[in-house]
């Protein structure tokens, strides 16, 4: 590593020269850095806006799932079976699916060796269970904080290697040399003078592990503080893929946490409170049959994400009813674990569907109030909220229908390299998932992508530019950064208000319920803001410049994602996945408003992906066919020969 302070067009900029850089300190970021180091690329650094920020460190659920190849029991499984299953969820590139499947076991075993306590039976088998969108029992878990444990174990190993860390650095621009990455610029969030504000990283192998676009919504399960950097990549010319495909689900508002699994299976009471303080048990108002209502709540535990296929008569009607109470009737919505639905002293368990009854019976939980059943079935799920200041024995839990995961993201190849040479994207920032994905598959994908990217970089290393050329290459981008600072610096600040306003509108127009006409008008609104941002956005000090650049990235991401949704809607495509597109035709759930009328997609576009390109305040879109699942395998001697020559890394 070489560090110098340069004058670039009269601006003072710190420069750092590296062979490779990882941006992001979550599970995927740490894994990428470790894989680079273990592949003998040691002139590296990890850059993060906050070492303890990020989704993988700060999220979980009642039993957070990690998805991997089956390693228990007598049911057949294979790399290709797993790849085919991942591919089958629609709009998935087969080479990514095969790579995620083939890397599943080595990445999982690595985590076990690093100390993540995935359970085994007395014979050493890694026991599994079936999760959502899982045809087998590939799921496993280390408890409510699986991804946090992963991150901490990876961090401990990372720190043992003495790899450099630049903390408090926000990615603001990617520098290009033609169609290749030449470096990137960060903002020092602690800087209080212009000459310490920006750092130019002279590096042509960049692994972006900055997570999903967490900052574009208000109702979000993503941890506060994590916003993502996809807008920075879009601005540099990185292509987006499957940007319409998200997961939305019920989650608590404070703290931000999925209320999946046991939180639903213990059959809590759903309550909304209107402006006069009156309580409404709105599920009981909608369902004519109490047994069907309770069974739907139970199913919501393992059918957690909102699924448009289950919106008419399935468990996802609950998501829509919560949405109506919160977003249309402007009521706050709560889960009450202190009282049974209908305020019953004892529930009529015989009214439950067989699956729900048998599950609760096997768990010895056919008794008491929801909190009693929770303590019986999964007391750590209670302890988790208690550790965050919420006692479910004493208070209700506010919830909403929240953005939880972006299945799309930056388009990458089979080595997780974007269309910008040298820019690799791993973790949720990468768009390797499709319309659906199994629960926990994102954690596997993050580890697999990190390993693949690091391996490719180690075999095709792009050495950094000579510093003088690097400075010249970055000149326009450096000036752009300083010009933005000059434009938004003022004697007052409106950053907070602008962020809240736009994220609330994103919830309303570009969330789980999407009206094509409203999408288009919202897209135009964001575009106008972007074009005039330097006049609209104001901050009163350099200390707030961190938020100013975050809002800039947020608006770019909001525009590109909303434009993608609007493009999808205008093409005549229909409702699929975790979003409902309002239509004049089709069906709607019984007794709900016309905004919930939709036409279900029949899968005719499952073998296509929609690609987005952002440039100069415009979004262009094109469709390409998915890459099929490769045959893989091969004649051993031939594969071995190639492996000895080039590691089969090409």
Task: Describe these PLM feature segments.
Residues 205-259, 440-456:
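Glycine-rich loop(s) and the adjacent beta-strand/alpha-helix scaffold that form part
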Residues 1-18, 35, 51-58, 110, ...:
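Glycine- and aromatic-enriched mobile tails/lids
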Residues 107-196, 209, 252-256, 260-263, ...:
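Conserved redox-cofactor binding core of oxidoreductases
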Residues 49-75, 81-84, 247-251, 257-267:
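Conserved N-terminal glycine-rich FAD pyrophosphate-binding loop of Rossmann-like flavoproteins
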Residues 15-18, 193-205, 419:
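Core beta-strand elements of the Rossmann-like FAD/NAD(P) dinucleotide-binding domain
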Residues 239-380, 456:
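An anion/pyrophosphate-binding glycine-rich loop and adjacent beta-alpha core
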Residues 18-46:
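N-terminal Rossmann-like FAD-binding beta1-loop-alpha1 element of flavoenzymes
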Residues 21-23, 200-211, 424-425:
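Short hydrophobic core segments
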